[in-house]
Amino acid sequence: MLIEDAVSSGTPQFVIDSYATLADRAKTQSFGLIEEDVIVLDTETTGLSVQDNELIEISAARLSGREVIDRFDTFVHPKQLIPAEITELTSITNADVADAPSAVEAVAALADFVGGCPVIAHNATFDRSFIESVKGGVNVSDIWIDSLALSRIALPRLASHKLSFMADLFGCDSVSHRANADVDALCGVWRVLLVALTDLPQGLMARLADMHPDVPWSYRPIFSFLAGQNPGSIFSLSAARADVLKADRADDRVDADELPVLKMPSREEIEADYAPGGLVNRMYPTYEPRDEQIAMALEVHDALVTGTHRVIEAGTGVGKSMAYLVPFAEAARRNNITVGIATKSNNLADQLMYHELPKLAEQLNGGLSFCALKGYDHYPCLRKLERMSRGQVEITTKRDPADTLTAVAVIMAYVCQSADGDLDSLGIRWRSVNRPDFTTASRECARRLCPFSLINVWSTVLAVVRRMPMWWSPTIPCCSVTSRPRAGFCLRFVIG
């Protein structure tokens, strides 16, 4: 898999170039103490619920630098039979676990192997909950590092942070839904993550390591060690934002009002896009032409050509999204303009963003960029993010405050590598994090008094004609998101 195909749409080229060299650098770069005597662990269970299911396999590896110096592997005898679907997934049978140690015996042996060293697991909350549900499990380790959350900090632009996806991308051992194979894969991915963290802006590791030092946080020692490799580096959020926006800058779009007429495909070309073997069929191999969808697409086409309006009512199963996306995309590409689409819900916007539009852009062979624009509370306020990262505000969550620090780190990393995007795509546990600590509302936005206002305005002027800004508290009224049209700018979704 190519890096270009593994990152989210709109990833800056400098980020792609950095990701492309990670696997090679991970083979030679050393990280001293933070990769000595660490345990990589994975488990297999009879299901997902710690209340209703049990351990059936535990695997762990002790790392010293780039080498595995010791292994721990055991089946676990459950009190219940292994469900057929689990056997199908893992290939672990009831015969395999018939003579295995009990959960208490297996976890006690694991505790002896780990010896209190830090434990790395992908989605560590899952593995830890099963281990600690067993008597003596809390003695395994006090330090659990979730490589899933760490991957979102280290590699914020990846399209997926599944272990299997990253292992395949970076040439690590493959994942097979067996604990020992998954441990082998994670051993390789772990070093890639450490290298990727060093590619984040200088000073960011120190900023993260120094956040709210009173809060126990398993990632703090990692960030502190990496910060020590560049002592004295100062992190600037405004400078990081300026760099990523500059790298993302492209030629301005044409103002549609300045065009005497839109260049559009003919009605026959639009019909051909929906015919067998046409554009839509290439996007969806099982697609079958629908007369209602073609009729709707032609109405949208005619409205664009004539500069008139249409109100179209279409039932379920017509394929409305593709009926309007194809003519709009052709209008945007052929005229170098930005087209706005107002969806009824953010869920529909996400469906277009992550499903239809990537497929459409691929079949159009480039020339189509797209991004989503939602309401205020879907985007981070840079001013609040800066204050939170400096420890200038209290953590207000009633749950584990470490989750808030992890959210700060994830958002910070994403901001430094992304010109646009929204909070919903970052995998943050909002049940444990107070979202208003990171977002703003119209009544509280500092606007021109905001220390990031110059960045916001620069990004906005660029974005209005090319793509919508994602990381700003809107300061230009015509770009505000509303639930009903206002001055012609009810923009929930933008392609261009």
Predicted region positions:
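Walker A/P-loop
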Residues: V305-P327
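Conserved two-lobed SF2 helicase motor
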Residues: P469-V481
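A substrate-engagement module of RecA-like helicase motors
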Residues: A256, I270-G278, N336, T343-M470
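SF2 helicase catalytic motif II
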Residues: C478, R492-G496
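Acidic, Mg2+-coordinating catalytic module of metal-dependent nucleases/exonucleases
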Residues: G115-K135, P156-L158, K162-Q229
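Conserved pre-motif I regulatory segment
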Residues: P265-I312
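Conserved non-catalytic scaffold segment of RNase H-like nuclease domains
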Residues: G10-W144, P156-H177
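Acidic two-metal-ion nuclease catalytic site recognized across multiple nuclease folds
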Residues: L2-S30, V192-R267, E271
